[in-house]
Amino acid sequence: MAAIPIVTEAEVALLCPVSGVSVVEPVAERKWVFRPGQGGDLSVAKVLDYARRAGWKKLGILYSADAYGEDGRNNMRKLAAGAGVSLDREESFPANSTDLKPQLAKLKSAGVDAIFMHGLGAPSAIVYKNARELELATPIISGHGQANSAFRNAVGDAVIGQPIVGAPVLVWGELPNSHPQKKVSESFVTKYQAKFGIAPDMFAGVAYDSANMVLQAIRETNGERAQIRDWLENKIKNYVGVTGVFNFSAQDHAGLKSDALVMMIADKDGWRLADYEK
């Protein structure tokens, strides 16, 4: 957020890969800023779609007490009622948490059908480990911030069987051939692994898409700042990237829909695509 007034004054287009929608809204005040990543609003929409399919009517929220966690909580508050879901309990945790059993116990006592967890860092892994220690049978469904190898390695077997929102590139091999991101994800992952020896995470995909869009904007214009901004806003239509299918406009500088994310299930090897997504 601190960069926004700087790029606005300098009139330089900024592609800002963050979760919150406030970086691009209101668009009239954020005309130089675009969000090329999947946001918390899209992640929550995906969670609520899964809740509908699972028959969950009552959710609890467990979120990190930071901008990322609060963005997830705020989006859930905004969207839950429209999806026919009530929010029966909210609990937060600080970024340096080492024990989340008290919060989990309160959520359990609330009798919720599932717990929506939205956080980053080590405490997110502790949530699942503490849940196993408590023999908590309530499902825990995570936002897309946990869909990375660092979290998966830290949490170990405690997360197996739990649903988590993630980027299609993480499970590209299981995507149906009709999925618009199948081919571009395969190409990106193959090249990335050949160069770096590891599989990319979703953040690498966001950076790749951002760079490609900016480079194309420069090629298609004379490189003048305002023309680059205008090109991004007016010419990015049905742009199939690793992150999703982008459609920027004068009214929308986020440009993605919830189909830029998929629901995954954690397994012993990492993740697998939820059956209904195949």
List each model region and its residues.
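Extracytosolic ligand-binding ectodomains
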Residues: 1-278
